Amino acid sequence: DCTMRIGVDLGGTNVRAGLVKDGRIVRLLSEPCKADRPEGEVVDQIASLIGKLITPDVARIGIGVPSVVDAARGIVYNVVGIPSWREVYLKDLLEKRFGVPVYVNNDCNCFALGVSRFGEASAYSDVVCVALGTGVGAGIVIGGELYCGHDTGAGEIGSIPYLDRDYEYYCSSRFFVGRGTTGKEAYERALAGDPAALALWHEFGGHIGRLVMMILDRK
C-alpha cells in the first residue's frame, strides 16, 4: 500500500499536521492556533497546513478536535479553547477543498486509537488513554475497538465532579493558572529546585493519581 494519510491535531494552543506512511510520521508541521479568530480563519489555517503536506498519494485525512463530534457527518461542536467554533461542518469544508475523504473525531479518541494500534498499548485489547493539556479527557478502547459513546463523548471525564469543582480544574493547565502560574513556568522552576514549584507538582500529581484510581475503580 503506497498510499499516505494526513493526521491533524487541533488544540486551543497549537495546530499540528503530519504526513503518515506505514504508521510513521514522515513530515510534521506545527504552528500556534488562531484560537481567538473567527471560525473561517481557523478552518483556513488547518487547510493551509494540509495543503503543505498533501500529495497525490494521500488517500484520506483524519482530524482530532477537543470537543464532542458528530463523527458520521463530521460536525464539530463547542471546541474547547476556540470560542468561534460552535458548530463547524469540518468534514464537508475540507472534502470540498481537497477531494479526499475526511474523518473527524474527538482528539482523545484519536489518541487512544493510535496508541492501541501503533504505540505502547498495541499488545492490549482494553485501553484507556488520558490526555492532559488545556483540558483533560480520555479515549477508550474495548476489545480492540474504539468506544465513542454518544457523540464521541464517552471519555469526557473532565466534567466529573471532584472536590469543590471538577477533574478538569485540578488535572489540566487550569490547575496552574488558578495558582497564578503556568505549567511551563512551574516546570522550569521545579527543575531549578524551587520548593514551592516542587510542592505544586506534587499536589498536581496527587490529583492525577486520584483521577486514575477513579477510572480503574480500584478499592
Write out the residue ranges for each language-model feature.
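Residue-level detector of high-confidence beta-strand sites
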Residues: L28-S30, V79, G149
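A short acidic/small-residue loop/turn micro-motif
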Residues: C33-A35, S84-W85, A154-E156
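General beta-strand structural signal in soluble alpha/beta enzymes
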Residues: V102-D107
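A charged helix-plus-loop insertion that forms the helical arch/lid used to bind
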Residues: G74-E87
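ATP-binding/phosphotransfer module of carbohydrate and carboxylate kinases, centering on a glycine-rich
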Residues: D1-I61, V69-I75, K91-V100, V115-D126, ...
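Glycine-rich phosphate-binding loop of actin/hexokinase-like ATP-binding domains
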Residues: S122-R174
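Short, active-site-adjacent cap segments at secondary-structure transitions
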Residues: S67-A71, C110-A112, G137
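Short loop/turn microsegments at loop-to-beta-strand junctions
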Residues: V15, G64-V65, G135-V136
